[in-house]
């Protein structure tokens, strides 16, 4: 099964009334180990590097976000400043000049999306939430 269509759906969910998407890249990784579910070949793929996926998954699996608080959230070789977590399922982070990332866990996956600098992270949060909650409704 290809998960890449979920990236398209997520980006579409972030559009505002004028049709502007507020997420330019996204991916889905497994909660158990951080292996990618979406492919890096997708035009809007958020490409985690090295151990980034495993480190993100470790924090969500353990529900211990102290590593994010102390060292930031690493994605695509960049360090984003941890802003907050909610309900041990949602993490928000930002990097000046780069934008922000939203991460939300379902039962078996973590949905991650990037909001470009100047975009509305709230719209990105909505897109991530729609996909994560859909996966959750499927028992995933």
UniProtKB/Swiss-Prot annotation:
<comment type="similarity">
    <text>Belongs to the profilin family.</text>
</comment>
<dbReference type="InterPro" id="IPR005455">
    <property type="entry name" value="PFN_euk"/>
</dbReference>
<comment type="function">
    <text>Binds to actin and affects the structure of the cytoskeleton. At high concentrations, profilin prevents the polymerization of actin, whereas it enhances it at low concentrations. By binding to PIP2, it inhibits the formation of IP3 and DG.</text>
</comment>
<dbReference type="Pfam" id="PF00235">
    <property type="entry name" value="Profilin"/>
</dbReference>
<dbReference type="GO" id="GO:0005856">
    <property type="term" value="C:cytoskeleton"/>
</dbReference>
<keyword id="KW-0206">Cytoskeleton</keyword>
<dbReference type="InterPro" id="IPR027310">
    <property type="entry name" value="Profilin_CS"/>
</dbReference>
<protein>
    <recommendedName>
        <fullName>Profilin</fullName>
    </recommendedName>
</protein>
<comment type="subunit">
    <text>Occurs in many kinds of cells as a complex with monomeric actin in a 1:1 ratio.</text>
</comment>
<dbReference type="InterPro" id="IPR036140">
    <property type="entry name" value="PFN_sf"/>
</dbReference>
<dbReference type="GO" id="GO:0003785">
    <property type="term" value="F:actin monomer binding"/>
</dbReference>
<feature type="modified residue" description="N-acetylserine">
    <location>
        <position position="2"/>
    </location>
</feature>
<keyword id="KW-0963">Cytoplasm</keyword>
<dbReference type="GO" id="GO:0005938">
    <property type="term" value="C:cell cortex"/>
</dbReference>
<dbReference type="GO" id="GO:0051128">
    <property type="term" value="P:regulation of cellular component organization"/>
</dbReference>
<keyword id="KW-0009">Actin-binding</keyword>
<dbReference type="InterPro" id="IPR048278">
    <property type="entry name" value="PFN"/>
</dbReference>
<keyword id="KW-0007">Acetylation</keyword>
